[in-house]
Design a protein with these regions (language model features):
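Short secondary-structure boundary segments
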Residues: 67, 237, 242, 304, ...
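Short, surface-exposed acidic
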Residues: 40, 95, 298-305
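Local cysteine-cluster metal-coordination motifs and their immediate loop/turn environment
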Residues: 224, 302-325
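Conserved active-site and cofactor/substrate-binding residues in soluble primary-metabolism enzymes
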Residues: 23-27, 48, 217, 221, ...
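Short cysteine/histidine-rich metal-coordination sites, predominantly Zn2+-binding motifs
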Residues: 309-310, 331-342
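ATP-dependent adenylation/nucleotidyltransferase module used to activate substrates
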Residues: 121-296
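Short, amphipathic alpha-helical segments that act as regulatory/interfacial helices
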Residues: 29, 227, 262, 321-324
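Conserved short alpha-helical segments that host acidic/polar catalytic motifs at enzyme active sites
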Residues: 1-121
Length: 342
């Protein structure tokens, strides 16, 4: 319609003036001011619904999307568009591929200039916190950065759950942060993790170098729950304690995992909402995390890392081994572990 190609649904076209129109897209030429990239962004703010649009201007063209996908392929002086990458891929030469427009973005197709569409954002951060060294440090990092921090702890039946619950209460009080508890039922899984059964827990370096205690899809499940809670309770940021050291043995601690999950979030929450994942210690090893937390005054004496339950850290399992070693490398005393016994 008048130089505008639209894929999606305009839910408020009648309110915008398309009272008797059968096709919602017919209202767009009246709504879209194509004078500049900024006026495009201002115009689409009036629309309630979904859209991936290509808009012809006087001497250029614009593309703008919310969550509807749009792929671009430049070939022989022509720009091809599609909502699916596979429609354009056969046209690509070796080494080429269609380029996706980032969700909630407008672009001037001649100059390449882009704008991000405004979304609902705030400084509320939901830290997925086990009460261990890494995620507790993350909570204090975000507080230092000015976030309004709340702690989300999952009850999934691990052996150290009673100790973790106590730890979370103390950390929340020290941080002056709300602590939210959510239960996840793993009891129906057969052949499950040693953390959930009476299976063997590896000790020392063996426990630190391989994911013997892997809980099936734990971080994926927890992130799905955290995303739902964040959206429902108006949190823009979800923070994780994923780090470089544990990425070596846990696939869901790899940076690529959080990068890919972050891409899903634009399609997992309501239109106009933003929920993002941050990993403030994602590029750090354990000893670097301890050094950072020490500077910030993190109360490591309150934290719990041990896979085994009990009144004290066992000093044997992989997490005990890793944290004790991390403190040693900083010439610091680990306030939670007297000594290693491996």
């Amino acid at each position: 319609y008048d130089g505008i190609i639209h894929n999606g649904i305009i839910a408020n076209d009648a309110e915008l003036g398309n009272v008797n129109g059968l096709v919602d897209s017919m209202i767009l030429p009246q709504v879209i001011d194509r004078s500049s990239l900024d006026t495009i962004v201002d115009s689409v703010a009036k629309i309630r619904g979904s859209y991936a649009m290509v808009i012809r201007g006087d001497d250029t063209a614009f593309a703008v999307v919310n969550y509807k996908p749009l792929y671009l392929l430049r070939k022989d002086g022509t720009i091809y568009f599609s909502s699916m990458e596979r429609h354009l891929s056969p046209e690509c030469l070796f080494g080429e591929r269609p380029v996706p427009l980032e969700p909630y973005t407008a672009v001037d197709l001649r100059s390449g200039e882009t704008r991000s569409l405004p979304r609902q954002e705030n400084n509320k951060a939901l830290v997925v916190c086990s009460g261990g060294l890494d995620s507790t440090t993350v909570a204090y990092v975000l507080r230092e950065q000015g976030y309004d921090v709340s702690l989300l702890h999952f009850l999934y039946g691990c052996k150290a759950e009673p100790q973790e619950v106590t730890t979370m209460r103390h950390i929340g009080k020290h941080l002056n942060a709300e602590v939210i508890y959510q239960a996840i039922d793993y009891t129906s899984l057969s052949g499950s993790s040693p953390l959930l059964t009476n299976g063997h827990i590896a000790d020392g370096a063996a426990g630190a170098e391989f994911a013997s205690e892997w809980v099936p899809a734990r971080n994926l499940v927890m992130l799905a729950h955290a995303t739902a809670y964040a959206e429902a309770n108006n949190f823009t940021t979800i923070a994780l304690g994923n780090n470089l050291e544990e990425g070596g043995c846990y696939p869901d601690n790899e940076e690529e995992f959080t990068t890919l999950f972050s891409k899903v979030l634009d399609y997992a929450v309501a239109d106009g909402r933003r929920v993002r994942i941050v990993t403030p210690v994602g590029n750090l090893m354990k000893h670097e995390i301890v050094a950072l937390g020490h500077r910030l005054g993190v109360p490591y004496e309150l934290t719990w890392s041990c896979y085994r339950g009990g009144e004290e850290h066992c000093g044997k399992c992989g997490p005990c081994f890793m944290r004790y070693t991390a403190f040693q490398r900083n010439n610091l005393h680990d306030p939670a572990i007297r000594e290693l016994v491996v």
